[in-house]
Amino acid sequence: MNHKVGFVSLGCPKALVDSERIITQLKAQGYELVPTYEDAGVVVINTCGFIDSAVQESLDTIKEAMAENGRVIVTGCLGAKADVIKNACPDVLHISGAHAYEEVVNAVHQHLPPPADPFTQLIPPQGIKLTPRHYAYLKISEGCNQKCTFCIIPTMRGKLQSYPMAQILTEAKKLKQAGVKELLVISQDTSAYGVDTRYQQIEWQGKTVNTRFYDLCEQLGELGIWVRLHYVYPYPHVDDIVPLMRDGLILPYLDIPLQHANSRILKAMKRPASSENTLLRIASWREICPDITLRSTFIVGFPGETEEEFSELLAFLKEAQLDRVGCFKYSPVEGAKANDLDNPVSEDIKEERYHRFMQVQAEISRNKLKNKIGSTQTVLIDEITEDQIIARSKSDAPEIDGLVYLPKISGITVGSFAEAMITDSDDYDLYGDLEYSLA
């Protein structure tokens, strides 16, 4: 019997972690993963349904798999809208929502029974990872308690459920032992970690720690590898983490989605509504940890956004001088409360504002990177091509930030650290020469 499974993972890093967990279970039960539809006995697709373009990509992928294989199991965020999937592809075998690991595995069992002798001994202790060996995503919770009007994540993934502290720290230790040099801490609301447990106390390696964001960062910092924080909602207690960055326990890097700067728009989004307070906090973080890299994301073209309100966002951007910025044009998501707001912004204006926003940020980024010329940066080697080395500094998260390009020399391996002298820069990337390897 064919025990081969095709697997497609779409969407964000949080979905990638879900895929890793499902794949680990399937591999432990003896299934073989194959890269093509035609060789698979069944195909599993982990979908994204956050915005319209993601929904369309998911549906297109399902249709492609149905056309080339015909035996398809669908899971992930779009699975929460089973009717949408059924209308487009009525013959899919099974549909489940996000983080439904056991349900997906059981569906595979039903339509493709597992081998009699699973090869559990072949599964590494850290599980199967879909990232390069030297970095890994560490998911610390599921769901979100926020009520942002542009978002439907709580509908798809439920309320906040923090994973047990000991489970997270054990996974982190296994990843380090497997050679991982960088942990990317992710969730829907990273800084809310532990709220749902009322900061339950646990015993960990002979000491008492609380199930809360600060304690988790502190314990991860003791591993002695890069720890990078993503999706950090700007709660007041986030300020407490910055000294850990200054002291070198975790990377001086904070991914903190701010979404906008105008108070009326922020209130309509149901987000913290004080850009003045945000600017004061940014100044405080930089005073405590001068090397901190601040990344954020913003939405332009939110319903009702006026030219004056957009100009206020640009003014905030210029004053905040954020290091890394992403921007999204508002996209109405089925089920989001923001869809009911008056005065939707036209697509032409959204596009025009997006480009103006990115032009402002490109200049900020260009000037910030120019200031790094002549400095020495610790870099992590991501890739070695025929003619160059591609690396990242402490300021660069994989896939979403810039890169450091270096001339190829012998004795350097992927996943190793090195010191690089920066000699040039552009809008988003750095260029330099290797000084020496840190192994």
Curated annotation (Swiss-Prot):
Domain MTTase N-terminal: 3-113
The protein's enzyme class: transferase
Keywords in alphabetical order: 4Fe-4S, Cytoplasm, Iron, Iron-sulfur, Metal-binding, S-adenosyl-L-methionine, Transferase
GO cellular component: cytosol
One Pfam family in the UniProt entry: UPF0004
GO molecular function: 4 iron, 4 sulfur cluster binding; aspartic acid methylthiotransferase activity; metal ion binding; protein methylthiotransferase activity
Annotated localization: Cytoplasm
Chief site of localization: cytoplasm
Reaction(s) this enzyme catalyzes, per UniProt: L-aspartate(89)-[ribosomal protein uS12]-hydrogen + (sulfur carrier)-SH + AH2 + 2 S-adenosyl-L-methionine = 3-methylsulfanyl-L-aspartate(89)-[ribosomal protein uS12]-hydrogen + (sulfur carrier)-H + 5'-deoxyadenosine + L-methionine + A + S-adenosyl-L-homocysteine + 2 H(+)
Cofactor(s) in the UniProt record: [4Fe-4S] cluster
Family classification: Belongs to the methylthiotransferase family. RimO subfamily.
Protein name as annotated: Ribosomal protein uS12 methylthiotransferase RimO
Species whose genome carries this gene: Legionella pneumophila (strain Paris)
Source organism phylogeny: Bacteria, Pseudomonadati, Pseudomonadota, Gammaproteobacteria, Legionellales
Protein's gene: rimO
